[in-house]
Amino acid sequence: SDVYKRQPSCRIQLLRLLITEAASPTMIQCLYSLWETERVQQLNERDYTTLAYELALRIPEQGKEILQTQRQRIHNPDRLRQFDFISRAMTADTLKLDSLFRSLLQAENRRIEPWAATTLSYLNHPTRQDYAVKYIRPALEKLTEVQRTGDIFFPRNWVGALLRNHDSEAAYK
């Protein structure tokens, strides 16, 4: 039946959602096991890279090792450059995070807009919501420049990446 044929696709979509939303230690460990063994053949390199990013943020004591392993799995030079750009946002070092954020405020560091938006999104990841609230005002103050120097859709992506994961009163203010 048609429903049966769509089931594997639905399962992968649910797994992709779980990758970005998992919060319990048990589920994070389960995802780590999936990532470590690469046993879900329906997941592609991008899926495993996203999983590595999420795991690096959710298991910071293993983050460096996770990212190093994932980097070795990437063979496409363009995807490797993308990984090197975005993975800088996975550090637990707040000085490096702040420096990375400041670099995104410079137009030349936003040239590849999808990478910049993804990096900004990880800087404002739900696990960092309290810390990252300080990025909101400076990033919004750059919005006119982002609009002037970027693609027509980039300002919306910039604001979405910045605010999507914030729901605190401090962020609202």
Q: Where in this protein do the model-derived segments appear?
A:
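Long, ordered, helix-rich scaffold segments
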Residues: 1-173
